Amino acid sequence: MLKCIAAVGTVVWMTMFLFLYSQLSNNQSGGDSIRAWRQTKEAIDKLQEQNEDLKSILEKERQERNDQHKKIMEQSHQLPPNPENPSLPKPEPVKEIISKPSILGPVQQEVQKRMLDDRIREMFYLLHSQTIENSTKILLETQMISLMGLSAQLEKLEGSEEERFKQRTAITQRIFKSIEKLQNPKACSEAKTLVCNLDKECGFGCQLHHVTYCAITAFATQRMMVLKRDGSSWKYSSHGWTSVFKKLSKCSFDEAVGNTEAKPFAEPSPARVVSLGIVDSLITKPTFLPQAVPEQLLESLTSLHSHPPAFFVGTFISYLMRFNSATQEKLDKALKSIPLDKGPIVGLQIRRTDKVGTEAAFHALKEYMEWTEIWFKVEEKRQGKPLERRIFIASDDPTVVPEAKNDYPNYEVYGSTEIAKTAQLNNRYTDASLMGVITDIYILSKVNYLVCTFSSQVCRMGYELRQPSGADDGSKFHSLDDIYYFGGQQAHEVIVIEDHIAQNNKEIDLKVGDKVGIAGNHWNGYSKGTNRQTYKEGVFPSYKVVNDWRKFKFEALLD
C-alpha cells in the first residue's frame, strides 16, 4: 500500500506542477503575470503542505510496520536478548501476536485511504472549477481521472474487501434484529410506545424521513413505534401503509394504544404512550438525532464505511421500506428492465417541479451528464477496459428521458416517462404516483453510482437505502448542490487537521483541533462553515478538515 500511496503522491505533484506552469504560460501581460505568480505561489505553498502531510503519513506507516516487524522478530527469538535488562520476562510466542491484532492499525489505514481519496477528489474539484485554456484543462483532468482510477484500485489490491463486506453485513443484521425485538414486544398493551403520524404535510421522501425520525427516536428511547391508526389514513394511498409495505410491528395501533391517552413526547417521560411531533418543531434537539452513530459501532463503522451516519439511517429506512409481496413483484419486474448485469449504470435523479426556484436551483441535464461521464472515465481506469455508457433517469419531468436519448446518442438511456407524469403535482397523491416514486427510489438504490441533488429527499433516500447492502457506497455519488444531510439533524461538525491562514476576506483562519460547523461544500476545493472557536464564518480548503461524527449510546442495540 505504501508504494501505491507514493505513486499517487508523485502523480499529484506532476499534475499540479503542470497546472501551475500552464497558469504562468497563459498570462502574458504584466498585471496578469503578477497575479498569476501570486496565485502560483499560493498553490505551491498549499502543495508543499499536502506533500508534507503525505510524507508524514508514509513515515508513520513505515515506522509502525518496522516496529511490528521488530516485535515479531524479538518474539520469535531471532534477535538476541537485551544484555542491559536480562530480567525481562520471556516473550509470548509469535502466534499469540498474530492471533490478536490491534484494531488501531486497520482503522488508521482505512481512514488514511479515505483521506487520500477525499484529497484527490477535492483537487479534481479545484482543477475542474478553474478557467484555464481548454486543452490544458482537458490534459489536467485526464491525469486526475487516471489518478482517481489508480486510487480506486487500492481497495482491490489490498484483497480484504470480501471480509469487510461480511463485517458490514453483520452490523446491518445486528441493527435489524435490535429493531425487530423492540418492535415486537411480548405484551403489546404493556409496551412503552411512541405514536407517529404518517401524514406530515409534504411529499413522499419527506414523509418517509419523518417516519425514520420517529423510528430512530423510538429506538433511542427504547419504545415500540406504531403509526397512528396503523397508517390507514394516508394522503398517498386510500389503502394505507400496508398497501405497499409490510407491517412495522405485530402489534396494531389498537392493541398498543387502545384508549390510552398519548402524552406529548418528552425525554425522559414516565408515560407508557407518547406521541411525537415533527422534527421541525423541536427547540432543543436530542443528542440521538442524525447524524449520530451508535457509540458501540462507531469504531467499527469508521473503519468499514465511508459514511457511518448514512449507513445507520439507511438501515432504518431499509426496515421501514420492507415491501409486501405485491409491491416486491412489481419492483422485481421494473428492475429486470434495467440491464444491471451487463455493466455499470449511473442513476440520475432530476427534480424539476415543486422545489425548483424555492428550495433548489435549476440544473440542466448537461450538468448531470458531465459528472456521469467523469465517473465512467474513472471507472474505466479502475477496471482497465472500455465501458458501455448506460444511465437510469428518475425525474418528475417527463421531457428529461427523451431529451437524454436525443442529446446523448452514445448512452443507453433507461427511465419511465409514465412514472414522471405521475410525479406531476396534479397527479402526485395517488396510488400510481406512490408506486412510481417507490420504483424510482428502489432502482436508484441498485445502480453503481448516483448523480443528483441532495436537496432532493428522493435522491437522499436512494443514497441511504443503498448503504446497508454490504458494500461501502458512502462515496458513490455526486451531488450538484448540498452535501448529505438529514432534515432536522444535529449540527454537522468537522475537525481541523491542518492550519489555514485566510488569503482573503471570504476565507477564515483555522487551527488544528478547531471544530467547524459545516454549511456545505462548494465543489471547487472549498467548503463553507463557522469556526466554533473564533465564531467566524467563511470558506476554507475542504481537505484541511475531517468529519467529527457524533455518537450516542443506543441501549436498545443488541450485543
UniProtKB/Swiss-Prot annotation:
Q: List the disulfide bonds.
A: C188-C251, C196-C214, C202-C206, C452-C459
Enzyme class label: transferase
State which residue ranges cross the membrane.
Answer: 5-24
Where are the residues of the annotated region Important for donor substrate binding?
351-352
Q: How is the cofactor bound?
A: May also use Ca(2+). The enzyme has substantial activity without divalent cations.
In this UniProt entry, which residues form the Lumenal topological domain(s)?
Answer: 25-559
**In terms of domain of life, where is this protein from?**
Eukaryota
How activity is controlled: the entry says:
Inhibited by Fe(3+), Ni(2+) and Cu(2+).
Which positions are glycosylated? N27, N134
Annotated membrane topology: Single-pass type II membrane protein
UniProt entry tagged with the keyword Metal-binding:
yes
Q: Where is this region: Disordered?
A: 63-90
Cofactor names from the entry are: Mn(2+); Mg(2+)
Q: Which residues form the GT23 domain?
A: 190-480
- Any one Gene Ontology BP term: fucosylation
Residue span(s) of domain SH3: 489-550
Q: Does Flavoprotein show up as a keyword for this record?
A: no
Family matches, as Pfam families: FUT8_N_cat
Tell me the keywords, alphabetical order: Disulfide bond, Glycoprotein, Glycosyltransferase, Golgi apparatus, Magnesium, Manganese, Membrane, Metal-binding, SH3 domain, Signal-anchor, Transferase, Transmembrane, Transmembrane helix
> Under which EC number(s) is this enzyme classified?
2.4.1.68
Its function, per the record, reads:
Catalyzes the addition of fucose in alpha 1-6 linkage to the first GlcNAc residue, next to the peptide chains in N-glycans. The addition is prevented if the GlcNAc residue is already fucosylated. Involved in susceptibility to the nematotoxic C.cinerea galectin Cgl2, likely by contributing to the synthesis of core alpha-1,6-fucosylated N-glycans to which Cgl2 binds.
Of which family is this protein a member? Answer: Belongs to the glycosyltransferase 23 family.
Query: What is the name attached to this protein's record?
Result: Alpha-(1,6)-fucosyltransferase
Q: Which organism is it from?
A: Caenorhabditis elegans
